[in-house]
Amino acid sequence: MSKEDIEGTNILDEPVHGIYIPAALFVVGVAITTYMSGELKILWSLPILFMIIFVRAYSAYKRRRSLYPDRWTSLELEDQTIISKNTALYRFKLKTRLESLDIPAGHHVAVRVPIDGKQEVRYYNPISSKLESGYLDLVVKAYVDGKVSKYFAGLNSGDTVDFKGPIGTLNYEPNSSKHLGIVAGGSGITPVLQILNEIITVPEDLTKVSLLYANETENDILLKDELDEMAEKYPHFQVHYVVHYPSDRWTGDVGYITKDQMNRYLPEYSEDNRLLICGPDGMNNLALQYAKELGWKVNSTRSSGDDQVFVF
């Protein structure tokens, strides 16, 4: 075990020190005591020992972690699913089928892949719910000049990718805001989905959420079925779509995000409300400008965890 593995680790959480050595010492002690005393009743303590070993071993198995914020670990690709013409969902196996990702809402993971002899690092937001176990789901959109997204597109089941995390600064607490407004664009929906899963899986969280989601075309709207299902099941959540190039069948808003749409669909400024923005830089800057004009207090520097207007 490396030094970084040992640091911050309780030595008794390691199977050798917390299970095998104590169990062996106990068995030897029982054998010696039984031999010297002739009391066979002492052997009845062995089933209790085996129960303790089982509980400790099961706990150690569940404690195995797949992600660390300070070092890389390799995860195996289980499968991939195409969800749009240039986007796919990649499912990676965690170390055990019992493990659930404990990633704070709105935080991301770092991904490292080898390309042309160099290690390229990118950041993605897992969309796996805390209630799901055994896997990590990433949505990756392929870009014409995207080296890492092209690398992902070439992966096959059984291939491995290096991960590190969680990483991020957003702070979210249940019921910390009465009304949460969100502006998202393209693949910027992934951290939003994390937050939505965090809210709707906690019955006590009564935060109202309004989402304004922009894309180039209807086919570019990622995870639309999931978002529509959430909006149907949870009365506190509303979603509004905007597309730049609509089809003849489109009945929603058209164009780019506007100040009027933000004013119409999202909460107004209040100390009890909050605004999150996640998308391409151009959209983020435009949404920030509109937020200022609508009275929101915008931090002039990089967003920090508790900012009322937070840009991912």
Curated annotation (Swiss-Prot):
Top EC class for this record: oxidoreductase
Domain (FAD-binding FR-type): residue spans on this chain: 70-173
Pfam families recorded: FAD_binding_6, NAD_binding_1
Transmembrane segments: 16-36, 40-60, 180-200
Activity modulation: Inhibited by diphenylene iodonium (DPI).
Membrane topology: Multi-pass membrane protein
Known catalytic reactions: 2 Fe(III)-[cytochrome b5] + NADH = 2 Fe(II)-[cytochrome b5] + NAD(+) + H(+)
Stretches assigned to the Extracellular side: 1-15, 61-179
GO biological-process terms attached to the record: ergosterol biosynthetic process; protein transport
Gene Ontology terms for molecular function: cytochrome-b5 reductase activity, acting on NAD(P)H
Expression induction or repression: By calorie restriction.
Cited InterPro entries: CBR-like, Cbr1-like_FAD-bd_dom, FAD-bd_FR_type, Flavoprot_Pyr_Nucl_cyt_Rdtase, FNR_nucleotide-bd, OxRdtase_FAD/NAD-bd, Riboflavin_synthase-like_b-brl
Keyword entries, A-Z: Cell membrane, Endoplasmic reticulum, FAD, Flavoprotein, Membrane, NAD, Oxidoreductase, Transmembrane, Transmembrane helix
Residues that, per the record, bind FAD: 153-168, 179-211
Compartment annotation: Cell membrane; Endoplasmic reticulum membrane
Cofactors, names only: FAD
CDD domains from the UniProt entry: cyt_b5_reduct_like (cd06183)
Main location per the UniProt record: membrane
Protein role: NADH-dependent cytochrome b5 reductase that reduces coenzyme Q6 at the plasma membrane and mediates lifespan extension by calorie restriction by shifting fermentative to respiratory metabolism, probably through modulating the NAD(+)/NADH ratio.
Note: Present with 29000 molecules/cell in log phase SD medium.
Family: Belongs to the flavoprotein pyridine nucleotide cytochrome reductase family.
Designated name of the protein: Plasma membrane-associated coenzyme Q6 reductase PGA3
Taxonomic lineage from the root: Eukaryota, Fungi, Dikarya, Ascomycota, Saccharomycotina
